[in-house]
Each structure stands twice: as structure tokens, then as C-alpha cells.
Amino acid sequence: MSIATTPIETPKSPKSTEPQVRKRKKVSTVCTNCRKRKIRCDRQHPCNNCIKSKKHNACVYDDGQVSPANFSTNGSSHGNTVPESRPYEESARIPIRFDAEAPRKKSKPNTPNNERKNSKKSPDNTVANNQQTASENEVTITLSELNMLKQRLQNIEANINAQSNPQSNPSYVPQTPAYPTQPNILPPPVSFNSWSPKQSNERVMFSPQQRLTTNYNVSHTRGQSPSIQLPPLSFKDTPRASIDSAPLYSEMSPPRSDLIASSLTSPESIQMSVSGDVVGVNPYLNETETINFYDGYTSICVRDFRRVNHGPFAWSSLMRKDKALSSLWNHILKKKEKKNVASQTFVFGQDVHEISQENTQLVASESNESETKFKKKTLETFGFNDVVPYDILKKKLQTQINKTTSPLGLTLYEEQVNMELQLVDRIHQQLPKKKVLWKLIDRFFSLLYPFMPFLDEIDFRESVTKIIGETEYKDEKIKELKVEKRLDLAVIGVLLIILRMSYLSLFCNKESVNEMRLKTTDPSPEAQDMKYLLQNPIGISLIDSAQNCLQYFDIFRKTSMPVLQCAYFLQLYHIFAPEDGDDGDGADTYALNSMVVRMAYSMGLNREPDNFKDVLNDKRQNHLGRKIWHFLVIGDVHNSYAFGTPKLIGDDFYDTKVPFIEEGNENLIDKSLDQYVTKSVFPGYFSIYNSVDQILKLILSVSRRSKVSEICKILNQFEIGIAEQYGTLSDCLKPKENLIHIFARNMPVKMYISLKSFLVSVYFHLFLYYEHKNDSLSFFYLRKILKTGAGDIMPHYFELLGNSEVVCDMVINPKLIQIIHKANQINIALIIRVNMSIYRMKNSQHHAENCKKDDFYYSYYKELCKFSSCLTRCAEVGIAAVSKLSTRYYYAWKITKGHNFLLKTITSMEFYEKESTNAQEITLPKYKLEQIADLENICEVALNKLGKTSVMGDEFCSNVNYKKYKGDQTYSTSSESSSTPNKDSPLDSRKYTNDFGLDLVNNQEIDKIWLQMLSLKSEEAQQQRQQESQPFTSSQSQSQSPLTSANQGYMPRPESRRGSYYGNTPFALENLNFDGFGGQSKSSNNGEADLSSFDFFVDLPFDQLFTN
């Protein structure tokens, strides 16, 4: 094995004039610490001075011999218990350095004078400890010394191998690992940049970054030249009983720290900042390893006539790739199959089912029963209505034509012009009063326009005025719509969408605030306008009409700016709509986004208008085109890093300039706001665009494997860029006095969450890649996942929900739901691994005896139990947070119900009893005790900020109670956090948590609302398919439903909704036959209209899902 070493600098007094380079070949017998401090050393292993100064782990001699304290079981050779210290403290004090000048002076002899000159040229950036100054010089290393070091390394390697040889350790008992592990030797070195002494010597030391410490570039190349690595540095050893007590070990005994050596280049020793974060550091195994993010799972889902592809960051891809999550899903399927053998899911379905006659009849039926409507909707959204035989539909349509006639004399077979006029008539009935309409338009251009600046306000208001009449704030209905040409339908479509989105922006996540606004007696114009708009809701039916407007244009052959704007706004609505949403996989809007991009290409928005001044000479239209194009570019990149979908826009295929400020090109009446948007949106985003684009090119490559080293190097720059531009989420959430508009306060938060969600996905893929290859690297990326998801973002869940002064709820909520979905998915995967490790230890033959006799074994088991408690509480916090949105967001409701059921499943003993045969693949890697404690501490600190101290479901915790083995029968499901730092969290950290509460919003009233919405959507879809043969009447448009009533968009607590809210025929949840539903549909869906979407929700056993 080739062991690489990196030279370390030996500090020297700044006033000394002695030569820097060692002149003697004789090995010093004094340890490096004593030599630095210039004190007498007793030459022990470790020496007394190092023990007193708590540096026993760094007691190293020049011959490469490391203190046995790093391998002993007692802490020191003197029997003293050494206080604990973090593993990277010493490495942080001794940064890795290379001298860039020494190899270039080959022609000059290594005289003391020349050596002194060389050493003076080296900059001194040494990180000093509390006993040293910051002006210590570094040691230059020449080629001759490198050869000498290589010779020494061979001796070091032989010593380490001898110490780690099980046969040489009389107290070692052979263990059978639960999965393949690394040999108990030095782990493979971590690489950043290749380095060879024969090549040109470039400075590999990076300068310190802002708010970051030095970025270490540890060099290592395999197959090129002998590599260089620092002497090993072990983790601190937890005081425990000596191994000489010969405890009885089972196959699940924890890894012993005294049998595992660690390296300075291992991830545990990398320390980049004072707070313990490792920013800009992403280690890898070697320069030759490659990865493909599509390996290990099937990204294409096929069921019957339907086929869907998902990117590597979609929830379904992570679910299928992770062995723990896939085993959970298989377990759920087995439970369903016991009750219904035909039950299958679309995500993990294996058999191709034929289209049954039962399903065909169900889709074509017109039953008003709630259960039938629900089943019918799920079949329709999976595309069953596309395969219903025409002969069945012909009979239905003929019956309807004979039964009903239109007052205008229109039938299904009349010309398209008549159908367009019929649509206009229906829209006329749906439009709100004049005052509501113009107030909502004003709200859009003052509040929402910066988030979607795709209209010219002057042109739009002029077009709307021609259609509905002059601007009048009167509380009266619009008399008529003057539609002169088909293109006016595109303008009407845009109008309907912005009315709906402006209405949705009125609502706050705090129900108390919404109630106060609805019942306010404040006479101020702002408060009264808010109350008036809330009392005049904008229904979902307007979006259906807007989509119908778009369908009358031949967008596959030709298009225009109003049509493009209508399609683009429709795509954005599907992202922000509470009843819709991207659903965590991006499939809902990907097809529509692709169409919008192709429309923009066909219109030439990818070309710079200044290059065609003969035809493109309207400043405002040119400015609008630039904004639309670059927002499409931003959205394309966002879809790629959020869901893993391929990019649609190539950098080589457009030359459109970034929008710029020019006199006369403003698209708003408020010119200052338009200029503010122009100068703030694009520079802030494109500053990190290059790094994201480079990462995506490597990660999303399907045809080739990418080098892990290249991905990690770009990730380093990307992380540093995020830290420099955004800081932390706490920094983004601090209101800035100079940023008046909510857009400026909101966009940094949204961008930060989006980019961190992307990084968590990448870290999880790297964790899975290294899980069975290298424990050190898998731990490193697991730690980064928890540091980002639990340590950085989770404490702010409720602040993101309630801090409307900084964030716009409608804009932030979809992204917040997505990252909670992803974080909880990873939490569940980790809980399965930790609990399976606990389960195997607990069920081993000598578990009780080991707990009583071996303190280390007991400590390891105890830390696993506490870590399980922390992860479970993190998952419960996520479910509780997203449940607060379940009253208004359908996607949030599905996450609440689904994840709550999954969490109950994995915290029961039944799951582990039945899945124990697959335990080797879903067990936590054998991390050290200190590593598990570190992960637990990250979670505990975050939970402490939220005040989450107890586990709601404690079945598993009660069964694996570790305290009974020490005679302490008092047990609590909360983690023991007496030693947790930051115990007294700031009051404002829990302010928003207290406003919402950590309880789970789980109410049958809410379930009925969303289930009824699915039934209503089914009915609306049926009516749309028959609208050509059915006349539109005002009585039909005025029918009430839970989502078209006065409370639409705002759903107060269930107690205030009982009674008339559900109409005359309440939706009976208890009447739904979920078992039959699962068997009939084979592949049911979430109730959304897009056929490219599916989710885990309806694949769960419904009879258990809705049981509290």
C-alpha cells in the first residue's frame, strides 16, 4: 500500500537566525511538542509534558513513532485519564504547507545561506495555538529530504500494520462485521490536487477566505509518484475498561478505537472554521475513482401505458437508490399485499398490469358518490381516460347531446369560434367585481411583479382596459367582455392567473393573522382593502379557464408574446399554487417549462435585440424580452439542481444580454422599482451560476462517469461562494433596513434554501457512494448532511413559516415544503440504519453481559440509542412544521400523512423483526464512538433551539432501553442533553416555534377537505370533457364547494369550519373503501391533473394512513 505523507512545518522563533532546514540526518529522540517548546522531554510514549498539556495524541517523534496513547485502551501509559479533545484541534494548529521555491533552486547547493533565503521567501500563515505566536516559519523540504521521508514511511507502515494485525494483539477477539469494512489500517488518503515532486512546483496552499480558515490541499496521486501523508492522528479515546477484561463480543460489537488508526488527511481531522463547520472541503478517496449519479437504481418508472423518468435528486430516485428506504417501501408493500394481492405502486411496481374493464367503466361513469369520484380522479390522473374505448364515449356524448341544448344553439360539432365565444361567456361569469379586479392588479404590480417580471404594465393595463372597460374601483360586476380577436384570449388568460396569485398572496401562514385581517375594525385604507379582498375570493376555476384560453392557440407551430406570457404564468402558478405544487420531483412543470423554452427559442428571445436594430427597436419590448429569457435560464438551472432534470438551454445557443438599466426601457409605471429589480436579480444569481453549471454537467451526465475529484473541487468553490454571498440562513433572515421591498428580503432566503437543498442531495449521493467503501468519508458527508439540514435549516422551520416581515409566504412555502420533504426522507433513512444497528446489538447473545462488563460497549450502545432519539425528534419536528401548512397546501398534507405513517412504521419493532434478514445492507457503518457522539450533538443543539426534548412515539425506544443494564430503571425518551452546548438558546429562537407549536396538525376535517377536493377535481374534469355538448349557465358557475366558497385559499381551523362549510353533502372519510381503492387502481395518484406526476401518498395503506 502506498502511503502518502504531507510535510508539516516546525515552528521557530521569529528572531532566530539559525538555518531552517535540518542539517543532520540523525533522528531526534525528543518529541516534536517538547522540541517546539524547547523543554526537556522524558522520551516516554507519550511524554509527561504532552500529558500535562493535553497533547498526548500529538506526541510524535521524528522516527515516525506515534505515542501508544493513540492505540492504547487506557488513555495513557501512566494510567491517567486524558481529558477529551476534538480530533482536529492539533491539525488546525499545524496547517499543511509546501515550499514553492525550494525545488526551483536545484542548481544551487543547499548551503545554509541559500536555505535561509528560501525560507525567508515563504509566506507565514501559520495558525498558532495559545502558546505560540503567529509568526512561525515553515520548514522547506527538498527532493533529497522527500526521499528520506519516503524511506521512513516504509518503516511507519510496517509498524502500523504490525499493530493492527489481529494476531499480534492477544486481547483481540475476531469479529464478523455486518457488512464489508476497511482493514484496520490507515485509511486511504484524501485528495484535492495532484502533486508530484518532478512536476513544476506550484503553490498548493490557498489563501484564507472571508469568514473561512485555510483551505487545505492535501496532495495524493496513485500510480504517478509516491504520495505524501502526515503521520496518523487518532481520535480521543473515551475512558473505558481495559480490553484485557476479555468481554464477550457478538458479531455486532462496536468498532474499537484502539484498533483503528486515523490520518490527518481523514475527514475527521479537517477543520475549516472556528465553529466546526467544514466549508469548502469535500474530500475523496483517490484521483481515479468515478461516479455516476444514475447508478444503483432505475430512474424510469413504467406502469401500463405510462412511463416517467426522474432525475437523481427527485424523492423517488433517492427512495429507490437508498437500500434502507427501499426496504421500508418493500415492507409497506408486503403489508398491503396481505390484504390485497393485486396492490401495486407505481414507484416500485414490477408487473405490467392490463387495463381492466372495471377501471374503464369507472373512468366513464358519472356517479356522484364521493368514493367513486375519488377513485375516478386517481385513475384519470394516471391517464386511464386516454385509453377508454371510443364506443363507450360515443354513447355517452350522444346521450348528452340529445338531452341538453345550448341557449345559443351551440352543439359539440359546431365551429371553434363558437367554442371560444362560449369560453368568453363563462369567463365573464367568473370574473370578480371591478374593484376587486383592479385592486388585485395593483397588488400584483406593486408586490409580486419583482418575482415574475414578465409583463409590461403599461401595455397590459391598456389591453385589459380594451377588454373589460376603463379602470373603475366600483363595487359592481363587469358588464361585458369585448373580445375582438383570438389573441385577446391570451391577455385574458394572463389576467385570470395574476388575479388568482394576487389573491393567494393575501394569506399568511399564521391563522390568527388571517382571522384578524378578515374581522378587522381598523379604519385605515390598507386594512380595509385587505379585508375587502379576503371577503371576495378568487376561485380555482379561473385557472382552468386560463388553461382553456391557452389551448386555442397553435403553440406547436407559431406563437406570440401574449401567448408566451400566458404559458409562462401558468407554469409559475403550478409551482406556487397551494392545491398544486411541484410534488418534490419536478415532473409536474417540466413538460410545460420545456414548451415555454421552445416557444422562446422560436420567437428569437435567445438573440440580443441590439444585433437586429432594424426590426427590434422598441426599448421596452427589448427589455421585457431580455428579462423573460434570463428568467427562463435561471428557472432551467433551478430545475436541474432541484430535481436533476436535464438542462434545456445551452450557453452556446444564446447571446441575449443580461437585462440592464436604460432610460426609457422600464416596464413598470414605478420606474424605480423596475430599475431595482433589474440591478438586483440577475447579478446576484449569475455570480454563482458558473459553479452550479459546472457541477450539473458532471452530475447529470448519463453517458459517462465523472471523476469524484472533479466534482469535489468544484463543490469546494461552490460552498465558499455560497458562504461569502449569503452567509448562513440566520444572516438571510435578519431584516435589512436598506432593503425596503419584500423581494429583496425574500430572494436571498429562497436562493439559500434552494442551493442548500441541492448540496444535501449531492452529499447524500456521496454518502451512499462511500457507505461501504470508506467509513471516514461516509461519516464526513453524513456529518455535512446533518450540519446543513439539522444544524443550519431545521432551527428556522417555524421562523420561515411565521416571519412574514422578511419572507413572502406564498413564494417561500413551496421551497420550504420541498426541503422538509428531502430532510425528513434522509432522517428516515438514518433512523432505519441506527435502529437496525441497535436491534442487532440488543438481540445478540451476550448483549446484556457486555453492557454490564464492558463500559465501552455500553457507551457505544447508549450513544446509538441517544442518536436514534435525536433523529426521531428531528423527523417529528419536520412533520410538525409541514403539518402547519397542511390546511392550505395539498403537497404539505400529503407529506404530513405519508411521513407520519412512515415514521410510525420505522419506530416499531415489527419492521426490524421482519427486515432483519437484510440487516447487513441497512445497518449504520461502524463509526467510532466519538463520531456518533458528534452527529448526535449536531442534532441535539438544533433540537434544543426549538425546545424539542421528547419523542412522541417511543415504542422502539422503550424496547431498547439502555438504562436498565446499569440498574437505572428511570427512562425518558428524551436525549440526555445536559452536556449539550448552547443550552440556553436565545428567546427569539423559540418565538416562532411557540407561535405554531410542535404538535402535529392531524385532523379528519382537513383530510376531508383535501379528499373532497380530489372528488371535485374529478367532477370538473368530466365537465370539461363534455363542455362542448353542455351549455354554460350562471347557476352552474355559482355552485359552492370548499374551494370556491368565501373561505377559499384561507382555511381556518377545523372547529370554525363545521356546519355549512362542507355544503349539503359532506365528504365522508369513513365511507371510503381504501382497500378496494388500492386494488382497483393498481397505480393511483395524488389527484393532480398532470400525468407526469406520481407520489408515494396513494401507495400507502389508506386504512392505516388515516388512523390517528
Swiss-Prot record:
One of its GO terms (molecular function) is zinc ion binding. Keywords: Coiled coil, DNA-binding, Metal-binding, Nucleus, Transcription, Transcription regulation, Zinc. This is Multidrug resistance regulator 1. Residues 134-165 form a coiled coil. GO terms for cellular component: nucleus. Residues 1-27, 68-138, 968-990, 1021-1064 are annotated as: Disordered. Residues 1-19, 68-83, 124-138 have a biased composition (Polar residues).
